[in-house]
Amino acid sequence: MYIYGSKKQKKTGLWINRKLNSKFGIDIELGAVIGYGLDIPHHMGIVITKKARIGCNLSLKQNTTVGNKQGLKEDDFIIIGNNVDIGANTCIIGSITIGDNVTIGAMSFVNKSIPANSIYITKKTSEVIPVINHKKMGLI
């Protein structure tokens, strides 16, 4: 509606965009191309750049960013295929391609292309550091 529409359709697109942003905290830039079946079960904190080209049946969880990085050329896009599930707190950045039937785990950082029929996770390490007992050391 916004890209190829008449003046009235573009104005309506701007109005819808502002309403989505203010009511739900969703920032989908005008110019993003999204196929049917977009599912956003928890809608807070969603950001999608106008450089996104998204297929059908995408599921986005809360606090997900599909964004471009500085220095992208005019013809660089983030391409996301069909039947993609993106977990919460995920950041997808740059001119990359995500294939069909991909699952991206929560809290992932994606800056490289992902082939079709894949599961992508960002490995994180956790470490528990014990607190020194200051009484035993005579510090207190």
Labelled PLM ranges:
Residues 83, 91, 127, 138-139:
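Accessory, usually C-terminal, subdomains that scaffold auxiliary metal cofactors
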Residues 116-137:
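Conserved beta-strand-loop-alpha-helix hinge in the C-terminal portion
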Residues 1-25, 132-140:
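Terminal amphipathic alpha-helical/low-complexity segments used for targeting or macromolecular assembly
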Residues 24, 30, 35-36, 41-50, ...:
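Left-handed beta-helix
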Residues 5, 63, 125:
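Residue-level marker of positions within ordered structural domains that often coincide
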